[in-house]
């Protein structure tokens, strides 16, 4: 069976010789027929530490290199700029904040708010 080759965006370069790459795809909902964004996160072996956060990279499936790493970096397709990285981090923070706000929306009122009323 041939090895899969896919493209994705580097989301983390904090580990030596390892990158976290996010592969985005669209999936059609079976009932509502709406396209939904899904993502897969892969840990990728980057022998020369060539890639950085925000870079678009091409990766290939490989034999297991560690507990999580099953992919190798083929090449960097597009280097990111500092502006791209800042925008990526800001978008991630906004998504986390919205997720927390939605989680807290269903919680009952606190004691201090109940006694003030």
UniProtKB/Swiss-Prot annotation:
GO biological-process terms attached to the record: translation
UniProt keyword list: Ribonucleoprotein, Ribosomal protein, RNA-binding, rRNA-binding
Region (Disordered): 97-117
Disulfide bonds: none
Keyword Ubl conjugation: no
Description of how the protein assembles with itself and partners: Part of the 30S ribosomal subunit.
Record-linked NCBIfam families: PRK05610.1, uS17_bact
Protein name: Small ribosomal subunit protein uS17
Organism of this sequence: Rhodopirellula baltica (strain DSM 10527 / NCIMB 13988 / SH1)
Taxonomic path: Bacteria, Pseudomonadati, Planctomycetota, Planctomycetia, Pirellulales
